[in-house]
């Protein structure tokens, strides 16, 4: 299994709005299309106004297929219209668990 970490720096003062919209609209759509929903976090200390999502996939090919389907969904495009102006920067990393990681 591979894990995708998506880190979004949200514009100042917009974090609560982003989290609410994501919970109501984005997450249900992602659960419909993507792999395993692992976790969703906001930052409390250090670099603030971040949300971090973790998703698990069987492989990079699985991730690519699922994300293509989601991007083609008109409802996903509507969701993006709601949140794009709230996001400052987005980064994505693929994480591979080591043999002794509790997440495999």
Question: What is the predicted function of each stretch?
Answer:
Residues 2-6, 18, 50-54:
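Short, structured motif recognition centered on aromatic/hydrophobic residues
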Residues 11, 36-52, 58, 77-104:
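Glycine-rich beta-strand-turn "strand-cap" elements at beta-sheet edges
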Residues 14-39:
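Short amphipathic alpha-helical segments
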Residues 16-18, 59-71:
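Short amphipathic alpha-helices within nucleic acid-binding modules
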Residues 22, 67, 80:
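Short, flexible helix/strand-to-coil boundary loops that buttress conserved ligand/catalytic motifs
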Residues 24, 70-73:
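Short, conserved loop/turn and helix-capping segments at secondary-structure boundaries
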């Amino acid at each position: 299994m591979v894990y995708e970490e998506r880190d979004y720096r949200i514009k100042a003062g917009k974090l609560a709005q982003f989290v609410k919209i994501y919970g109501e609209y984005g997450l249900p759509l992602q659960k419909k299309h993507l792999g395993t929903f692992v976790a969703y976090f906001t930052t409390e200390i250090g670099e603030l106004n971040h949300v971090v999502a973790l998703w698990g996939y069987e492989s990079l090919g699985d991730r690519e297929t699922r994300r293509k389907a989601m991007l083609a969904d008109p409802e996903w495009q509507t969701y993006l219209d709601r949140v794009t102006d709230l996001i400052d920067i987005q980064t994505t990393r693929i994480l591979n668990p080591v043999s002794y990681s509790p997440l495999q």
